[in-house]
């Protein structure tokens, strides 16, 4: 009697419903498993391929489908959009005969960039573009204190008077076209070299000083700048001591 009861349950309406639901669920799951990879492969096949630096036209069928699916081509920055090196110059001072100073543009760390020109015979630095420039100047000085029994004499001839060292940066012929140079930046330093009071003979101790400055100046293209330096006989020409330059910053 127990066996027929089991057969009645399996073959009844409820058993058939369970079998039907299981079959439908398996069919739906199989369809989903097959459709997902097929969709992915289709999208990959329709994506624009880069060939020889050229990207497929997004207006074509593949590009339109990608846009509908949410894919958008990002803009590519061209090399022409990159800013060029701004005008810049760095000049180095070297010794000239008979206590002179000469600026050079092709020595050690000196350089000229992006259209800047240096007129060596006149000592003028020409700037090619309108803009705001950072101008700077650094002059090193050194000397030797008088030996015992001597008195230090300033360049004016007064014994024992401190020396005021100075350097000035000018715009040649001025911005107004008046023909007069225009002072842009300047720096000063007053030094009193030590006097050696020892009784022995020989040279006194060395002393060192620096006059440096920098600032922002608005210049027009083609304008020229130059530097005036005092006490040329005391200028320090060792590496990294005496230089001036300009770089456009805006």
Curated annotation (Swiss-Prot):
Pfam families: TNF. Keywords: Cytokine, Glycoprotein, Membrane, Signal-anchor, Transmembrane, Transmembrane helix. InterPro entries: TNF, TNF_C, TNF_CS, TNF_dom, Tumour_necrosis_fac-like_dom. The keyword Transmembrane helix applies. The chain crosses the membrane at residues 27-47. GO terms for molecular function: cytokine activity; tumor necrosis factor receptor binding. It comes from the Eukaryota. PROSITE patterns: THD_1, THD_2. Belongs to the tumor necrosis factor family. Cytokine that binds to LTBR/TNFRSF3. May play a specific role in immune response regulation. Provides the membrane anchor for the attachment of the heterotrimeric complex to the cell surface. This is Lymphotoxin-beta. It comes from Notamacropus eugenii. The lineage of its organism: Eukaryota, Metazoa, Chordata, Craniata, Vertebrata.
């Amino acid at each position: 009697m127990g066996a027929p009861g089991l057969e009645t349950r399996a073959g009844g309406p409820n058993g058939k419903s369970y079998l039907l639901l299981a079959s439908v669920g398996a069919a739906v799951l199989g369809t989903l498993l097959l459709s997902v990879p097929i969709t992915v492969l289709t999208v990959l096949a329709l994506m624009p391929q880069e060939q020889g630096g050229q990207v497929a036209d997004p207006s074509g069928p593949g590009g339109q489908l990608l846009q509908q699916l949410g894919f958008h081509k990002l803009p590519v920055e061209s090399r022409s959009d990159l800013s060029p090196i701004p005008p810049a110059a760095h000049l180095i001072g070297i010794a000239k005969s008979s206590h002179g100073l000469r600026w050079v543009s092709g020595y050690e760390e000196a350089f000229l960039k992006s259209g800047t020109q240096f007129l060596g015979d006149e000592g003028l630095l020409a700037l090619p573009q309108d803009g705001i420039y950072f101008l700077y100047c650094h002059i090193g000085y050194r000397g030797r204190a008088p030996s015992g029994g001597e008195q230090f004499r300033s360049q004016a001839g007064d014994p024992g008077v401190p020396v005021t060292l100075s350097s000035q940066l000018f715009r040649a012929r001025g911005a107004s076209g008046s023909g007069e140079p225009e002072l842009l930046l300047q720096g000063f330093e007053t030094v009193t070299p030590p006097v050696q009071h020892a009784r022995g003979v020989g040279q006194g101790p060395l002393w060192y000083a620096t006059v440096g400055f920098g600032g922002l100046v608005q210049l027009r293209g083609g304008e020229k700048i130059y530097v005036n330096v005092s006490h040329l006989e005391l200028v320090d020409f060792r590496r990294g001591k005496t230089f001036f330059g300009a770089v456009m910053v805006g």
